[in-house]
């Protein structure tokens, strides 16, 4: 069983408009409302590829119950921790080929709720074999909250796949308890190291070999349409992917995390892990719906990906 954590989930609302009129009424004919958050995208893709998955995190109020019901309808198991605050909305206005987003901050977690979730998590940890942590921390939690979770996973021998950025990731990396996998992109690497980077092999090798990343088994760097670069222990890989028609890239990173987590759970070899992860990321990009993959195209894309030891 895989446990996914989305500590700051949202109800994602999409408003498609022919044109956005400012300071005027905009009428929307089709509204899409989904259970949102990076970790829930990971959850949906894991469920689609047939992995046993359990979703957890903080939810509160009517919007929190909406998320739970959406997962129920998709037959996805969940064990959320209920809080006093209201789960947030995240609104995307799609207009003239552009996307304008309005993101609520979300609820503030108090000390009692923060401690309560850790105890809740410790109980869930007893019955899972891998943990995928995605997205930002809600207001009120200390920057080392993910580090506290990772410490408990490491004490139980449970691998952790972590997808976050900024100060939260920096805090984790400076902690003695390390995740099994991190998945930064080039700009996130730059923020962490505060040094110039490019996509050359030497630059990437030097970056991921910095002392900051010591103790992390897998570092997988997304290069967008150029594929990926990875370091597994002391081995480096370059991943070349085919050119595809991209319909909606949002959620592709989360689908990649789902592939990594699935491969870690099933003890797949390095090449298959990298190919599975990138295949699911590309499949998501070919769909309008975020966190959805059409597995009919899986084998074709998987076989076109090239993984080279460099």
Curated annotation (Swiss-Prot):
Gene3D superfamilies referenced in this protein's UniProt entry, alphabetically: 3.40.1190.20
GO CC, any one term: cytosol
EC numbers: 2.7.1.144
Gene behind the chain: lacC
Keywords of the record: ATP-binding, Kinase, Lactose metabolism, Nucleotide-binding, Transferase
Pathway(s) annotated for this protein in UniProt: Carbohydrate metabolism; D-tagatose 6-phosphate degradation; D-glyceraldehyde 3-phosphate and glycerone phosphate from D-tagatose 6-phosphate: step 1/2
Reaction it catalyzes: D-tagatofuranose 6-phosphate + ATP = D-tagatofuranose 1,6-bisphosphate + ADP + H(+)
Signal sequence, start to end: none
Example GO molecular function: phosphofructokinase activity
InterPro entries registered for this protein in UniProt: Carboh/pur_kinase_PfkB_CS (IPR002173), LacC (IPR005926), PfkB_dom (IPR011611), Ribokinase-like (IPR029056), Tagatose/fructose_Pkinase (IPR017583)
Protein's UniProt name: Tagatose-6-phosphate kinase
SUPFAM superfamilies assigned to the protein according to its UniProt record, in alphabetical order: Ribokinase-like
NCBIfam families noted in UniProt: 1-PFK, lacC, PRK13508.1
Family named by the database record: Belongs to the carbohydrate kinase PfkB family. LacC subfamily.
Pfam families (UniProt xref): PfkB
Organism of origin: Staphylococcus aureus (strain NCTC 8325 / PS 47)
HAMAP family (alphabetical): LacC
